[in-house]
Regions:
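Non-catalytic, mobile gating and regulatory segments of ester bond hydrolases
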Residues: 1-56, 60-181
């Protein structure tokens, strides 16, 4: 399992577009962040061999996990599943469609009142089926946090939607810091 945690800097607001590793249009800021950790991922993946990979991320980490999953599948030809929680939209429709066809499962969990999955706006779109975790309708920053009882909602999602993570070997964590612009 590769877990990419959230992180926030002013460069997260950079919403230009660029081409991803699969030559589709994606958010430039997310792609720049992914590019900054790609060499670390390559070292890790070279050690794992041909074992399946689960890419997991929350918030911005979900966007980076999305880009990582596509890159891993394209370059390592191993089964990859993607699990995101409260992730923003990553790319245009062509990117989302290619992501859906190349990965071995996309599980995109959102809290109904979390504003992060609503950005960036069109023409960015999500890949994969959405799993809503609450019936709340108010927009609050607290809806986006993965702490306390809200974390329980995410755990419920993994346990009861048939997405148990069976992992052999060590669980690896990859965190990142974006380079300043």
């Amino acid at each position: 399992m590769i877990y990419i945690r959230e992180g926030y800097t002013i460069t997260d607001l950079h919403c230009g577009v660029t081409c991803s590793s699969n030559n589709k249009t994606v958010h430039a800021g997310f792609n720049k962040t992914f590019e900054s950790i790609k060499s670390q991922l390559a070292i890790l993946l070279d050690q794992l061999g041909n074992r399946p990979v689960h890419c997991v991320g929350h918030s911005l980490g979900g966007a980076i996990a999305n880009l990582a999953a596509v890159w891993i599948r394209s370059n390592y030809k191993i089964p990859v599943k993607l699990y995101t929680f409260g992730s923003p939209r990553v790319g245009f429709n062509a990117y989302a469609m290619q992501t859906e066809t190349s990965l071995h499962g996309i599980y995109r969990a959102v809290h109904r009142s979390d504003p992060v999955p609503m950005v960036p706006v069109w023409p960015f779109v999500h890949a994969g089926k959405e799993y809503r975790l609450s019936t709340c309708v108010s927009l609050t920053g607290a809806s986006h946090m993965m702490d306390g009882k809200r974390l329980g909602n995410y755990t419920y999602f993994l346990k009861f939607h048939g997405n148990r993570l069976s992992i052999s070997g060590a669980v690896r964590h990859c965190s990142f810091r974006k380079a300043m612009m």
